[in-house]
Amino acid sequence: MKRIEYKWLALALLWVAFFLQQGTRQIYGPLLGSIQASIGATDVQLGLVSTVFTLVYGLTIPFAGFAADLFSRKWMVVVGVAIFCAGILTSGFVTCIGALVVTYGLVNGFGQPFYYPSSTSLISQLHADTKATALSLLQLGMYGGVIGCSWLAGWFAGLGTEGWRLPFKTLGVLGLLWSLVLALTLKNTQPPQPSQPPQPSQPPQPSQLLFSALRAMFSKPAAVLIALALGMEVYVDVGFKTWMPNYLSETFGVSKASAGLNAVLWHYLGAALGIVVGSRLGDRLVKRIPTVRFWIIGGGLLLGAPFIFLMSRATTYLTCCLAMFLFGVFRGAYDSNNFAAFFDVVEPRYHASAAGFNLMIAFLFGCFSPTVLGWTKAHYSMSTGLATLAGAYFVGFVLLAFASRIYRPQNLSQTNTSK
């Protein structure tokens, strides 16, 4: 039997970790009603838990990316998975909203950032010739985690007032076990060397590395604009995933299990279609049209915005699900080339650190969405709150349109030299 090439084994290992990372994020939304009934909390307090998580994630992720470039990307992934799964596990035992802020918001929010910059940097290096395709396959792990764990959470929520605790405990234990698998199986792949190392005879100092990483991103206006556009997408994504299950249950009267599943199923089925098509187009055309990745991700946000609005105003369950599917198709197109475009701009040696700065900007903006939507629900309606998300997508499109105008082919990172 032919031996599996390591780059595909690494992708599979990181895929499962991404499934767990995103799945543990998604279980919170379908459980809102059960958590509220069990421990008592207002809509704003429930939104605050998600806001604290997103804020801590955004503040931590640049340090996680920098640590990965300075130390070991493998161990950043392993430690990150272990920490956030410990936070998820302990969330299943809390008895008040304050404790949930600590376990889910702080501990979980601190551990999760250590996974993504390191994993995407590793995959970008190992799959230099098929970068968008490999990153898109990784992204499918997110979609699978969100759909599967959302259904699981909704099903457990229907078991009774305390059923909401079981998804936290189950996924927490599974994640801790998977961190051991990663520790034993992942290789400690060394990052590529910078094109102009400061001193070939000695390793760079942390301060030099930090300055170089900051310069690698912030000296490229296109990279900054990509990060700001990602902030618009994260604002939409966090608010959508937090409140959509509750919205479907209250607006259309479906069960918690059905709401938890359908709030993400149709959206991510559409996204899977968009990501497969978008990634192949990006990889095939980028050598002939260097800005094609910008066109794909910008077009995804522009064309997705009308369907977000339709989703929020739908008067029938079928129309709402159809709108979520089409919203997902264009969200998938965005996801398919977002980090590939970013890594084209930034020097490979600093991919993990730059990805951390990128996500910091995005999540510091996106963290406000759950609380804003909770406040809008209390004072107006959740339909109104969801409708405003379409505007964030349009702003993201404008930012990417500017990025495509200022990006030049000579900025393209020479990733093919790094195997």
Label each region the model flagged.
Residues 1-4, 190-227, 251:
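Juxtamembrane intracellular "pre-TM" segments in multi-pass secondary transporters
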Residues 59-97:
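Conserved MFS/SLC helix-loop-helix module at the cytosolic interface between two early adjacent transmembrane helices
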Residues 102-142:
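Cytoplasmic helix-loop-helix junction between adjacent transmembrane helices
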Residues 26, 54-62, 146-147, 267-276, ...:
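Residue-level signature of mid-helix packing/kink "hotspots" within the transmembrane helices
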Residues 138-188:
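Helix-loop-helix hairpin linking two adjacent transmembrane segments in secondary transporters
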Residues 92-103, 310-323:
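Helix-loop junctions at membrane interfaces in 12-TM secondary transporters
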Residues 28-29, 221-276, 335, 339:
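Extracytoplasmic gate region of multi-pass secondary transporters
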Residues 77, 291-297:
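Primarily marks hydrophobic transmembrane alpha-helices of the MFS/SLC 12-helix fold
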